[in-house]
């Protein structure tokens, strides 16, 4: 009888149910639920956050690439469009105007008898087939006798070298800005040059003219004589020292013409803080052109304005396709 009762009091084999009940204890169940909850929260929050920051980064990249569209730089034709005609000729200026450039840079040199021509020494040397001749070595009559068509075929109009006054008569009312790049040389160097330039600007009524030069003496003389005239100075690498010229060195100047490899974000910020504009020169290749756009310079001087205009249009299309919005 005792044996029978003992057998009935034994806990029957439950097939592992006890272990399962212990396995799913209240403590374990709470931890499991907490883990599941955290996983659900993570899956609910992380993907949206990831895509939010990913989209934000994409927008930042697009904005950096496309922000120049809010303030596009002036397209400045260096000596006109010298890919289609000889630089600083009426043909080159006409091609640039037809391309609807924003501005034209004119090289300004003075003859031995004091007449200002739209001419650079290197171009004179090509025309005259003389590697050492300078504009100041020749008189007005001698320069007027030179014929560009002898080295460049297919000219549209005059094949003669224009005076500065003739050049301004053609271009000053056709573009937003005219840059006069004044060259200092023998026999008179800076003597009287500022007044000669200002006199022609006044006669041509070129209110949109900018005068800049590598000679700070000349630039300061123009500022002193005509404070309302827009004046710039040049920043480049000093050929003697290999160092960059001082960036902020002329109070009355409103434009800083910078050799384009020297331009970076910091340079642009520093110049803008002084209420001056940054003009990049001379930019003739696609990669530097894109770089100038991304840096947000105010103007780009180029010998190939049509190429720069085409590049800007292509980038503009890309930006709009990527969802960039141009403020109006």
UniProtKB/Swiss-Prot annotation:
Membrane-spanning intervals of the chain: 35-55
Every GP-PDE domain range: 73-312
Catalytic activity: a sn-glycero-3-phosphodiester + H2O = an alcohol + sn-glycerol 3-phosphate + H(+)
Assigned keywords, A-Z: Glycerol metabolism, Hydrolase, Membrane, Transmembrane, Transmembrane helix
GO cellular component entries: membrane
InterPro entries referenced in this protein's UniProt entry, alphabetically: GDPD4 (IPR044236), GP_PDE_dom (IPR030395), PLC-like_Pdiesterase_TIM-brl (IPR017946)
EC numbers on record: 3.1.4.46
Localization (cell): Membrane
Tissues where the protein occurs: Expressed in rosette and cauline leaves.
Domain of life: Eukaryota
Disulphides: none
Top class in the EC scheme: hydrolase
Topology class, membrane: Single-pass membrane protein
Coiled coil: none
Principal location: membrane
One example of a Gene Ontology biological process annotation: lipid metabolic process
GO molecular function annotation: glycerophosphodiester phosphodiesterase activity
Pfam families tied to this protein: GDPD (PF03009)
Keyword Phosphoprotein: no
Similarity field: Belongs to the glycerophosphoryl diester phosphodiesterase family.
Protein name: Glycerophosphodiester phosphodiesterase GDPD4
Organism: Arabidopsis thaliana (Mouse-ear cress)
Gene: GDPD4
């Amino acid at each position: 009888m005792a044996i029978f009762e003992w057998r009935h009091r034994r806990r029957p084999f439950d097939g592992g149910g006890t272990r399962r009940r212990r396995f799913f204890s209240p403590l374990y169940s709470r931890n499991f639920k907490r883990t599941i909850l955290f996983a659900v929260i993570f899956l609910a929050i992380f993907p949206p956050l990831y895509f939010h920051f990913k989209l934000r980064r994409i927008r930042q990249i697009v904005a950096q690439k496309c922000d120049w569209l809010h303030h596009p730089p002036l397209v400045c034709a260096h000596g006109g469009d010298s890919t289609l005609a000889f630089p600083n000729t009426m043909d080159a200026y006409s091609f640039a105007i037809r391309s609807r450039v924003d501005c034209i840079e004119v090289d300004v040199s003075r003859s031995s008898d004091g007449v200002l021509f739209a001419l650079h020494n290197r171009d004179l040397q090509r025309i005259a087939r003389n590697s050492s001749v300078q504009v100041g070595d020749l008189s007005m009559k001698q320069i007027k006798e030179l014929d560009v068509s002898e080295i460049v075929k297919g000219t549209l109009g005059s094949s003669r070298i224009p005076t500065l006054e003739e050049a301004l008569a053609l271009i000053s009312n056709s573009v937003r800005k005219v840059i006069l790049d004044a060259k200092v040389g023998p026999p008179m160097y800076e003597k009287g040059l500022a007044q000669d330039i200002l006199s022609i600007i006044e006669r041509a009524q070129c209110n949109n003219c900018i005068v800049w030069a590598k000679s700070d003496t000349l630039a300061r003389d123009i500022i002193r004589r005509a404070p309302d005239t827009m004046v710039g100075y040049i920043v480049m690498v000093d050929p003697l020292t290999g160092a960059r010229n001082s960036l902020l060195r002329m109070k009355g100047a409103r434009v800083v013409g910078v050799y384009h490899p020297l331009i970076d974000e910091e340079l642009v910020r520093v110049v803008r803080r002084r209420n001056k504009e940054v003009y990049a020169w001379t930019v003739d290749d696609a990669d530097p052109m894109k770089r100038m756009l991304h840096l947000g310079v105010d103007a780009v001087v180029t010998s190939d304005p049509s190429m720069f205009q085409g590049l800007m249009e292509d980038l503009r299309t890309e930006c709009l396709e990527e969802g960039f919005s141009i403020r109006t």
